[in-house]
């Protein structure tokens, strides 16, 4: 069975500097603990970049204000 992005509850996205479009989907994750760890690693590895952790349309955390 092949999985699709809809099979995962969480995603980590890298946004452009204008916060208008997603430049890269960093990860699709099904487990919250793994999603939080992946988000923390993404923020640490890309300082100053706009990164979000989302559960479907809901933003759980973001690396910018």
Regions found by a protein language model. Name each.
Residues 1, 30-41:
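Charged, amphipathic alpha-helical segments
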Residues 1-23:
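Short aromatic-glycine-(Arg/Gly/Cys) micro-motifs in beta-strand/loop hairpins
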Residues 3, 26, 42-44:
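Sterically constrained small-residue positions within well-ordered secondary structures
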Residues 14, 25-26, 61-64:
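A general secondary-structure boundary signal
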Residues 22-32:
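A short, exposed loop/beta-hairpin motif centered on an aromatic-Gly-Thr core
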Residues 45-65:
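Short, mixed-charge low-complexity intrinsically disordered segments
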């Amino acid at each position: 069975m092949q999985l699709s992005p809809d099979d995962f509850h969480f995603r980590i996205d890298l946004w452009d500097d204008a916060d208008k479009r997603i430049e890269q989907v960093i990860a699709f994750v099904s487990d919250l603990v793994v999603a939080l760890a992946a988000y923390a690693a993404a923020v640490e590895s890309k300082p100053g970049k706009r990164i979000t952790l989302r559960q479907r349309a809901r933003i759980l955390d973001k690396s910018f204000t």
